[in-house]
């Protein structure tokens, strides 16, 4: 069965909207996920939460921690654990670059988006980020509010 010509290349499953507010995003990259069958079926049903998750290095491997993919409703005894550690697939060069940034410069790796690419593979968009201080968050919020107010004024008067 052919896909429609105007179908989007990426089917969004989950987005971490708080990451851009809580962190200063410095760099992004795409990583694959090692998933079980029932996890993929839950993702196809658009059921996932990556808002409180993060990526970490353990034993030379890259892991996604605290992501939530609920159990598949039609799955029986072969269902998965909803909050299990999930291995991330990243090239060695990217992994070493991220590891050096995280260990030396005090940065963190947070997920931004979870989606299926055009080949139907589950991918995770990761960001190398630095945590914002409280005053930076307030400043960001003030800028956003001012831009909304400017747009409203221009629209009403313009």
Swiss-Prot record:
Q: Return the Basic and acidic residues bias intervals.
A: 136-158
Q: Give the GO cellular component terms, alphabetically.
A: cytosol
CDD domains on file? SmpB
Q: Which GO terms describe its biological process?
A: trans-translation
Q: Name one GO molecular function term.
A: RNA binding
Region (Disordered) location: 131-158
- Keywords linked to the UniProt accession: Cytoplasm, RNA-binding
Entry's SUPFAM superfamilies?
A: Small protein B (SmpB)
Record bears the keyword RNA-binding: yes
Q: Where in the cell is it found?
A: Cytoplasm
- Cytoplasm as a keyword of this entry, yes or no, is yes
Please report which protein family the annotation says this sequence is part of. Answer: Belongs to the SmpB family.
Function as written in the Swiss-Prot or TrEMBL entry: Required for rescue of stalled ribosomes mediated by trans-translation. Binds to transfer-messenger RNA (tmRNA), required for stable association of tmRNA with ribosomes. tmRNA and SmpB together mimic tRNA shape, replacing the anticodon stem-loop with SmpB. tmRNA is encoded by the ssrA gene; the 2 termini fold to resemble tRNA(Ala) and it encodes a 'tag peptide', a short internal open reading frame. During trans-translation Ala-aminoacylated tmRNA acts like a tRNA, entering the A-site of stalled ribosomes, displacing the stalled mRNA.
Q: Which HAMAP family match?
A: SmpB (MF_00023)
Q: What is this protein called?
A: SsrA-binding protein
